[in-house]
């Protein structure tokens, strides 16, 4: 045998020994892991449950496959609720941000159902990517994707152009297809033109996902000739549909606001209520509030004067620390002031002023492909969260990214982004599923 052939045989033999050694080590590791995982089964159930409550969702999902008893415990609604309470408390010390958007968007003129949505979870403080989940929604959205705020780790993803209404928990990968709302059925009977979709029907694009005793979807929209329903008890300027998860059905509310809502603004929920801006009437904007528990509407008794007389395109509404916040970007100075509503709903306090025009942002613009310091942009940025170092995480309706604004240095830094990030929200994982 030649020397070259001998060396080849020796190398091959050595490689095979390494592979066999690797297999033995992996088998031994799996046996050890199984022993470790099976040890807690000898503990009392209440002690075991207290231990499990501190585990992250991913670990609990793995544990379910090891024991029928563990699966029964982890999937019980009482355990899910207790785990949710702990997750909310942990969020205060370790806040996270979720970016939700379409994956592999379909390009071209042909209308095809886009079916894959990606969920990217980031650490708020470090901007590091913690997890990525990609889920398939078989019915598709026809490139008109709208995503609600997160409610206990759940999202509602819907499309007015199709009958798609999904509720999803990206942490557990659970999703549920809901029946279409009444207006979705009515609209498709009329087959609106592209112009009618873009102009007339904008108020139907956003819904609220909330929880009182039970979870519910609240869909408030302006009336239109295409969505006249004889079964609706209301013939006013707005209609509201509520989805009941127990009955798996939508129902109309009899009493709805007598003000049309401003179509562009997403609803915000805080302190047990959902809020919408109205269209200007007599050069004044009102705020409609919906009590989640009693399912009744009211107008806020007091609105900040700087907001009430504004063009609705120049103001914004959001939730920070479960408080309703509103902001306006002044046309002269381009400085954006942010006010917070106190729980009594009779006092507004200014909490931040943002001066993006003064920010050097060339690096940020290059990464985000969006000019955050543009001088003639009157639409305000939307605060998403406040970091421990007092920096403010900002999004914008025209940007697919997030930036951190430092009020002390008046500077911004790129946080993260994605070309199709439709929704950017604070988020914590939960086990809540099977609504």
UniProtKB/Swiss-Prot annotation:
Residues 16-29 have a biased composition (Basic residues). InterPro entries: F-box-assoc_dom_typ1, F-box-assoc_interact_dom, F-box-like_dom_sf, F-box_dom, Gal_Oxase/kelch_b-propeller, Kelch-typ_b-propeller, SCF_F-box_component. Kelch repeats lie at residues 164-217, 224-270, 273-317, 322-368. PANTHER family: BNACNNG10540D PROTEIN, F-BOX PROTEIN CPR30-LIKE. Keywords: Kelch repeat, Repeat. Residues 37-82 form the F-box domain. It holds the Pfam family F-box. This is Putative F-box/kelch-repeat protein At1g13200. The keyword Transferase does not apply. Residues 1-29 are annotated as: Disordered. The keyword DNA-binding does not apply.
């Amino acid at each position: 045998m030649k020397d070259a052939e001998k060396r080849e045989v020796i190398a091959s033999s050595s490689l095979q020994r390494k592979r066999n050694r690797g297999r033995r080590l992996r088998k031994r590791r799996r046996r050890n892991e199984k022993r470790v995982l099976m040890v807690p089964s000898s503990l009392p159930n209440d002690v075991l449950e207290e231990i499990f409550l501190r585990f992250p969702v991913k670990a609990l999902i793995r544990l379910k496959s090891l024991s029928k008893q563990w699966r029964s415990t982890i999937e019980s609604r009482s355990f899910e609720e207790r785990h949710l309470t702990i997750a909310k408390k942990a969020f205060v010390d370790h806040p996270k941000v979720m970016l939700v958007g379409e994956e592999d968007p379909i390009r071209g003129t042909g209308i095809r159902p886009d079916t894959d949505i990606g969920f990217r979870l980031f650490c708020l403080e470090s901007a590091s990517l913690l997890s990525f989940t990609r889920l398939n929604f078989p019915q598709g959205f026809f490139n008109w994707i709208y995503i609600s705020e997160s409610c206990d780790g759940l999202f509602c993803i819907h499309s007015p152009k199709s009958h798609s209404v999904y509720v999803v928990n990206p942490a557990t990968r659970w999703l549920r297809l809901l029946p279409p709302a009444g207006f979705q059925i009515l609209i498709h009977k009329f087959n609106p033109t592209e112009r009618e979709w873009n102009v007339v029907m904008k108020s139907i694009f956003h819904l609220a996902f909330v929880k009182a005793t039970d979870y519910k979807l609240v869909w408030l929209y302006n009336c239109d000739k295409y969505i006249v329903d004889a079964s609706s008890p209301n013939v006013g300027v707005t209609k509201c549909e509520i989805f009941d998860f127990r009955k798996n059905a939508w129902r109309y509310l009899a009493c709805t606001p007598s003000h049309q809502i401003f179509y562009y603004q997403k609803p915000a929920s805080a302190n047990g209520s959902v809020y919408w801006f109205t269209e200007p009437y007599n050069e004044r904007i009102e705020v409609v509030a919906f009590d989640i528990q009693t399912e009744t509407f009211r107008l806020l008794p007091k609105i900040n004067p700087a907001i009430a007389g504004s063009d609705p395109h120049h103001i914004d509404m959001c939730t920070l620390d479960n408080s309703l916040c509103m902001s306006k970007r002044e046309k002269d100075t381009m400085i954006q002031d942010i006010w917070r509503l106190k729980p009594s709903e009779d006092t507004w306090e200014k909490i931040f002023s943002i001066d993006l025009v003064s920010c050097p942002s060339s690096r940020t613009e290059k990464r985000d492909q969006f000019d955050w310091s543009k001088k003639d942009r009157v639409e305000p940025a939307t605060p998403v969260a406040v970091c421990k170092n007092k920096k403010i995480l900002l999004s914008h309706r025209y940007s697919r990214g997030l930036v951190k604004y430092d009020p002390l240095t008046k500077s911004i830094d790129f946080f993260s982004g994605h070309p199709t990030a439709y929704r950017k929200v604070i988020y914590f994982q939960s086990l809540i599923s099977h609504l």
